[in-house]
Amino acid sequence: MRFGHFDDARREYVIDTPRTPLPWINYLGSEDFFSLVSNTGGGYSFYRDARLRRLTRYRYNNSPLDMDGHRIYINDGGTIWNPGWQPAKTELDSYTCRHGLGYTILQGEKDGIAAAQELFVPRGDACEIDRLTLENKTAAPRTLDVFSYVEFCLWDAMDDSSNFQRNFSTGEVEVVEGVIYHKTEYRERRDHYAVFWANAPVTSFDTSRDAFCGVYGGPAAPEAVKAGHCSNSIAHGWAPVGAHHFHLTLAPGEKKSIIFGLGYIENPVGEKFSAPGIINKARAEAMMARYATDAQVDAARRALALSLIHI
């Protein structure tokens, strides 16, 4: 059975079905920050060391496979779907995954709404950029609830998957104007944190997995996505996550983009805090400012392409 083909002109492998024999994964990054992205948007991110500086969780032996990752959910009047099919597994009217050199693009369409999820790791920055472009291909206005979702790893991937007696009490986050800072152990013994942001105003958010997915729910059908909104939860221990919610209306033929970023920030020991108990966000704010517009993201994509032109 054929699952895809090479596009020689664009130097991409094009996957035509989400139901590949196993997840087909692209490896993004060439310096310090890396992301593994499958053909359905599964995977994880890390800084330098995949065990000791893991930003997001991934369960290798999970059933179903490849449920953890860089997730976008679209709730269109109660129909919930993902641009890359997983984890909701709602049948799409069309699907394509393009694995390129340093980037992956997931394209899905459902009931006249087209969604493209573009992921890459830019040169010179410790972050993953994830741009979502939505298009209303119908003749009527459409109102959507759109969600982003990642599940944070508590840094040491081995400890994170085994030392539950300790881990259930260490998770810590901070949210400022919709920007989610994962700062587990930052006060005690670490000088680094993760930041998960969007360049658009957030309607609601969640940082507790139980609040977003539901205690008896999961990534296939999160309770917040079904409800059409998050609950602005703040995680204290247990399983911290990052979830943004946007309530959008698209006019006929209109396109809108939202730029998400997942970054790693490390501060010198003497600069950990900007005030007592307040983490120093200066480097995070500078990073977010570098990817605030489509023009900036396009420029970062071009710079990445130029760096790989001789490969």
Regions found by a protein language model. Give the residues of each.
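Anionic coordination/interaction segments
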Residues: 1-308
